[in-house]
Amino acid sequence: MTSPTVSTDRPVLRYEVLGSRRFSNYWWATVITIGGTGFFLAGLSSYLHVNLLPIGNPVELFFIPQGIAIGFYGVAALLLAIYLWATIGWNVGGGYNEFNKETGIVRIFRWGFPGKNRQVEISARIPDVQAVRIVIREGVNPKRTIYLRLKGRGDIPLTRVGQPIPLTDLENQAAEIASFLGVAIEGL
C-alpha cells in the first residue's frame, strides 16, 4: 500500500490496495506454467513416442505408470497456472480505501471473482467510524493489519493481503487515517 503525504485540510484521502497483481503472483504463475507445460509434454511424448521437448528424452519413459503420472502432474500444474493468471487478469483483491470529508463517506472497494459479487464495496458515514485499530502479530506467520472499526459493522480490514507491510509504514498510515477522520488509534 502506498503512503501518500496528505495534509488534514485536504477533503479526500485515498489509498490504492494492491490485489493479486503482485510480483510474487506473476513469478509463480510463470514458473508453474513453464513447469506444467514441460511435464505435460513429457507425458504426451511418452504416449506418442515422439520427443516434444528440447531437453531430455521422455520417449524412453513407459507411459504406464511414469508417463501418465507426469502427464497428470502437468495437467494439474496447468490448471493451477490458469487459475493464477485469471486472478491476475481480474485483479482479485485490488481496489482502494477512500475517505471523503466533502461527502462524509468512507468507501472500501475491492475487486472479486467474476459473478454476482465481482465488485465488493463497503460504504459508511464518517461519523460511524469509531476507531482505527492496528493488529500486530509477529512470529512464523506475521500479521500486520489496519482495521476500521464501524458502529454496528465490526472491524473492516484496510491493508492488503500477502507480504506484511513494514511497521513504520503501518503506524504512519494508521496515524494518518485516524488524524484525517478525527478518531483514536487502538492496539498500539
Curated annotation (Swiss-Prot):
<dbReference type="GO" id="GO:0009522">
    <property type="term" value="C:photosystem I"/>
</dbReference>
<protein>
    <recommendedName>
        <fullName>Photosystem I assembly protein Ycf4</fullName>
    </recommendedName>
</protein>
<feature type="transmembrane region" description="Helical">
    <location>
        <begin position="28"/>
        <end position="48"/>
    </location>
</feature>
<keyword id="KW-0602">Photosynthesis</keyword>
<keyword id="KW-1133">Transmembrane helix</keyword>
<dbReference type="InterPro" id="IPR003359">
    <property type="entry name" value="PSI_Ycf4_assembly"/>
</dbReference>
<comment type="similarity">
    <text>Belongs to the Ycf4 family.</text>
</comment>
<keyword id="KW-0812">Transmembrane</keyword>
<keyword id="KW-0793">Thylakoid</keyword>
<dbReference type="Pfam" id="PF02392">
    <property type="entry name" value="Ycf4"/>
</dbReference>
<keyword id="KW-0472">Membrane</keyword>
<dbReference type="GO" id="GO:0031676">
    <property type="term" value="C:plasma membrane-derived thylakoid membrane"/>
</dbReference>
<dbReference type="GO" id="GO:0015979">
    <property type="term" value="P:photosynthesis"/>
</dbReference>
<feature type="transmembrane region" description="Helical">
    <location>
        <begin position="68"/>
        <end position="88"/>
    </location>
</feature>
<comment type="function">
    <text>Seems to be required for the assembly of the photosystem I complex.</text>
</comment>
